[in-house]
């Protein structure tokens, strides 16, 4: 964990990424935080140690991943966040507005429309988790080589008979697409 003059700022860092501006973007699990558990996406100026951007939510239950998690800065400046526990993926703008939101409907390999208590992970294994864990997600642009020749306009439900599991709040910029992960 990262400390600033003895005051701990990050409680379980994951997915550190060096950005083009020299800063580091990371996922902070936020577990065991004295003020209460809450996860965050954090950008740190490594020269000064200052947090220059951070995404958190006022509703801790909506964004908490006790272990694991990931972040990806997209070419349009937005950040893709993977909150592992609960299978929650979402994209936020630099102004911290959520523009895309997805919850995995796959619980231990089975597609379900509605999660039940049986889908929760026993507390002795993970805190605050469901069996729809997603370790990390990447956003690929339409020009990604693995997508060449694919019909990207074709849409089908993830789980038959269920509603859409994502919400696009505003049309996200797609001019500059994310490069392939390294």
Spans of features found by a protein language model:
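Histidine-/acidic-rich catalytic cores in large beta-rich domains
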Residues: 1-182
